[in-house]
A protein has these predicted regions:
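Phosphate-binding and adjacent anionic-ligand microenvironments
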Residues: 1-71, 77-105
Length: 105
């Protein structure tokens, strides 16, 4: 599913830039999400990370709204998809620059 938390236009690109660095560092520190290692990090127009089982999460700035775009998917389970969302949401909430989501899982 795709979720869009509010983030001011003048802040959203900096928030994403900071998250790119954090996710790369978490991968380098062998961080696990729901028991799965982060195996790959792509940083084109945001950050997309993959886990060992093929599950993934993505954070990028919306190109046409004052918001971010958050996507999570998991072939393993809906529960893992939710845990990935919780992981991303935790990182975003720590920025102090995120408002309400249009929806959550």
């Amino acid at each position: 599913p795709t979720m869009a938390p509010f983030c001011k236009d003048e802040e959203k690109y900096k928030v994403v830039e900071d998250l790119v660095k954090q996710v790369e560092e978490l991968k380098n520190n062998s961080t696990r999400i729901d028991g799965q290692l982060i195996t790959d990090v792509l940083t084109v127009n945001g950050v997309r990370f993959s886990l060992e089982d093929g599950s993934w999460g993505l954070i990028r700035a919306s190109s046409n709204k004052p918001s971010l775009v958050v996507v999570t998917e998991s072939p393993a389970s809906d529960e893992r998809k939710k845990k990935i969302f919780d992981f991303i949401d935790n990182l975003l909430q720590k920025t102090g620059k995120i408002g309400e989501y249009d929806q959550k899982i």
